[in-house]
Amino acid sequence: MSNLRTYLEEKNPDYTTGALYYGYMDMTYFAFTPSNLKSRKLKIAVVYLHEPNSFEVWLGGNNRKIQAEYIELFSNKGTGGYKLSRVSPGVDSIIESTLSEQPDFDNPGELMRQIESKVIECVERIVFILGEQLER
């Protein structure tokens, strides 16, 4: 995850990259957010889930109030095929999408490129749904 974080940060200097966080033994994640989502108090998290051995991308809010507002907004606008979360204790996402199931850690370069591509695509679709132009 540390190498992935560094790779994404170097390849996408217009994104704000957060520190690497280790969850409750079940996940590891870091924020990777463009300014046009950050200004809306939203963030993108690149998440590795240990038990299913998969990578996901989550759209989250800066707090529970923001999260609830955007879950409501996306429930009315649609999610572009992404999984919409429900407001409930312990749920930290607004939208979730799988990036890689059973990732091939024997080919880290390809895995990082695949994850980058899917994260950027997800960000662009979210921005489109929200009706903004992506600043790149």
Region locations from a protein language model:
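Charge-rich, low-complexity N-terminal segments
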Residues: 1-28, 36
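Solvent-exposed, flexible loop/coil residues
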Residues: 34-36, 41, 86-88, 103, ...
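Aromatic- and glycine-enriched beta-alpha-beta binding-site module
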Residues: 28-76
